[in-house]
Amino acid sequence: MGEPQQVSALPPPPMQYIKEYTDENIQEGLAPKPPPPIKDSYMMFGNQFQCDDLIIRPLESQGIERLHPMQFDHKKELRKLNMSILINFLDLLDILIRSPGSIKREEKLEDLKLLFVHVHHLINEYRPHQARETLRVMMEVQKRQRLETAERFQKHLERVIEMIQNCLASLPDDLPHSEAGMRVKAEPMDTDDNSNCPGQNEQQRESSGHRRDQIIEKDAALCVLIDEMNERP
């Protein structure tokens, strides 16, 4: 008869799962599907649990004797349990020195085990409170970050407004308004018969050329102003 196969307590290497989820397997539909959701019961650390179990089960439902009353102060009970563990540990050391093979050694070990179970149970009852406090702290951090972001944005906005005001204050007084310089009035065409006269057409061309020269001069002034603003630190 062959030797029994040794089973490792550790999970298998993840590589044997990773190699199943290649791009080719996913495209061809050969990748393993995820396990279905558990509906009834499951095993964890060698114990069976139900999906509808309470997050913190009462001690009585686990077959454990309750050492503290139903209504109690968690801090006081934890201090009492801590002191009881210390005293029982010293008693266990005394038993191991005087009579290591005594039955009292097993009894004291069971007492210590029961005390530690109660300590862990009382600590676990603080988990919902811990979750609420963690959520509260996280929301406070997010609120503070948003307020700091809004404050920085407000400072940048005030700085931009100040820069614009300084630029406007540094403009020369003789600079024409940009609105008057950039806007070209659309004059209606004269449909009178006299508009076909050569002399009148020449006069219109001269006036339009004069206006064009004025617009070019204003555009050049604006370009110089923009270049000066860009050269400033």
Swiss-Prot record:
Cellular component annotations (GO), alphabetically ordered: core mediator complex; mediator complex; nuclear body; nucleoplasm; nucleus; transcription regulator complex; ubiquitin ligase complex
Keyword Ion transport belongs to the record: no
Disordered: region residues: 187-214
Basic and acidic residues bias spans: 203-214
Superkingdom of source: Eukaryota
Compartments reported by the entry: Nucleus
Recorded GO MF terms: transcription coregulator activity; ubiquitin protein ligase activity
Placement of covalent cross-link Glycyl lysine isopeptide (Lys-Gly) (interchain with G-Cter in SUMO1): 185
Keywords: Activator, Isopeptide bond, Nucleus, Phosphoprotein, Transcription, Transcription regulation, Ubl conjugation
Pfam families: Med7
Predominant place of localization: nucleus
GO biological process, one term: regulation of transcription by RNA polymerase II
Positions bearing the Glycyl lysine isopeptide (Lys-Gly) (interchain with G-Cter in SUMO2) cross-link: 185
Modified residues (Phosphoserine): 195
InterPro entries named among the record's database cross-references: Immune_Mod/Transcr_Coactivator, Med7/Med21-like, Mediatior_Med7, Mediatior_Med7_sf
Complex and partners: Component of the Mediator complex, which is composed of MED1, MED4, MED6, MED7, MED8, MED9, MED10, MED11, MED12, MED13, MED13L, MED14, MED15, MED16, MED17, MED18, MED19, MED20, MED21, MED22, MED23, MED24, MED25, MED26, MED27, MED29, MED30, MED31, CCNC, CDK8 and CDC2L6/CDK11. The MED12, MED13, CCNC and CDK8 subunits form a distinct module termed the CDK8 module. Mediator containing the CDK8 module is less active than Mediator lacking this module in supporting transcriptional activation.
Family: Belongs to the Mediator complex subunit 7 family.
Function: Component of the Mediator complex, a coactivator involved in the regulated transcription of nearly all RNA polymerase II-dependent genes. Mediator functions as a bridge to convey information from gene-specific regulatory proteins to the basal RNA polymerase II transcription machinery. Mediator is recruited to promoters by direct interactions with regulatory proteins and serves as a scaffold for the assembly of a functional preinitiation complex with RNA polymerase II and the general transcription factors.
Record protein name field: Mediator of RNA polymerase II transcription subunit 7
